[in-house]
A protein has these predicted regions:
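Short, flexible loop segments at the rims of nucleotide/cofactor-binding pockets, characterized by
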Residues: 54-62, 179-186, 209-211
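SIR2/sirtuin-family catalytic core signature
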Residues: 185-272
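Charged, alpha-helical interface segments at or near domain boundaries
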Residues: 35, 48-50
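Alpha-helical interaction segments
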Residues: 21, 54-55, 202
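Extended, H/D-rich, highly charged conserved domains that either
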Residues: 1-43, 58-61, 68-176, 182
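Catalytic-core regions built around general acid/base machinery
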Residues: 64-78, 193-196, 221-226
């Protein structure tokens, strides 16, 4: 696939030849179209729920994560909370904004106080090129030199107008895309550093992860760099057998929970 060889320097001549090949160009065009489709799909989902509807949901829900977020505003237990998310959407950012919880996006904004930091190694619909004209179109130009993170900026409005952005599509490995997507490698390194900073007194929560083979390499990198003595909670009603086995073998203080309703009580080391 495109992902497997695009970063190999010795393949550059072959890549250029393939761009000029009518036979193979269809696959590269499909790759370009997939990026635009994913951006547009998640942007449309985002626009389907206006802020007032989201605030209404947050005010009446018993969702465990909301309980956790609300606890953050009153608790002084944690001086820093880091979210490493592989989601393209901006629901987390919007929820934190609605709850008036300051946060920063790693690579784009300075840390807030108290510090809630979000790291998105696979990109986001909010990552767009600087000075980009908001016209919807599919660009078939293949930029083999890549886009660095300082060439991107955050945007939260009119996201359906952007045909280009920064996301790693499914089956993409940010390590192998360090040439064509250096912004992703920067954020992947930031996530690794965050993992290394975890101490035995810290809490780690894992959820929403399938442990599919294409993401396994990245997830293993984070898991193996975490402190084995930290408190580790995995939330999944049907945990993948392979992932569960890995977590049991790594972490001494491992707890598996079936519902996010439990997350609301993780502060102070308690469950609800």
């Amino acid at each position: 696939m495109f992902f497997d060889f695009v970063n190999e320097p010795i393949q550059k001549a072959e890549r250029v030849k393939m761009v000029d090949s009518r036979k193979d160009r269809i696959y590269l065009k499909a790759y370009s179209e997939l990026i635009v489709y994913l951006r547009h799909l998640f942007s449309c989902y985002n626009d389907s729920i206006p802020t007032d509807k989201l605030e209404e949901f947050l005010s009446g829900t018993k969702w465990g994560w909301v309980s956790f977020f609300k606890s953050l505003t009153a608790s002084k237990e944690y001086d820093k909370i880091t979210f490493v998310t592989y989601n393209y959407d901006i629901w987390l950012e919007r929820i934190l904004s609605c709850l008036k919880i300051p946060f920063s996006i790693k690579g784009f904004e300075a840390e807030t106080t108290p510090c809630v930091e979000i790291i998105k190694p696979h990109g986001s619909i909010s990552f767009v090129p600087k000075n980009y004209t908001t016209t919807y179109s599919v660009s078939y130009s293949l930029d083999f030199e890549g886009v660095s993170i300082d060439q991107l900026e955050l945007k939260y409005n009119d996201l359906t107008h952007y045909g280009k952005g920064a996301i790693i599509p499914p089956a993409g490995d940010s390590m192998r895309l360090n040439v064509t997507a250096p912004w992703s490698q920067h954020l992947r390194n930031a996530a690794k550093i965050a993992a290394l900073d975890i101490s035995e007194n810290d809490e780690v929560v894992l959820c929403g992860i399938s442990y599919w083979h294409v993401d396994r390499r990245e997830l293993d990198e984070l898991l193996l760099n975490l402190n084995q003595d930290s408190g580790f909670t995995f939330i999944n009603p049907s945990p993948p057998r392979d992932l569960n086995a890995v977590l049991i073998s790594i972490f001494k203080n491992y707890v598996q929970q079936s519902s996010s309703s439990e997350i609301g009580g993780i502060l102070n080391g308690k469950t609800v």
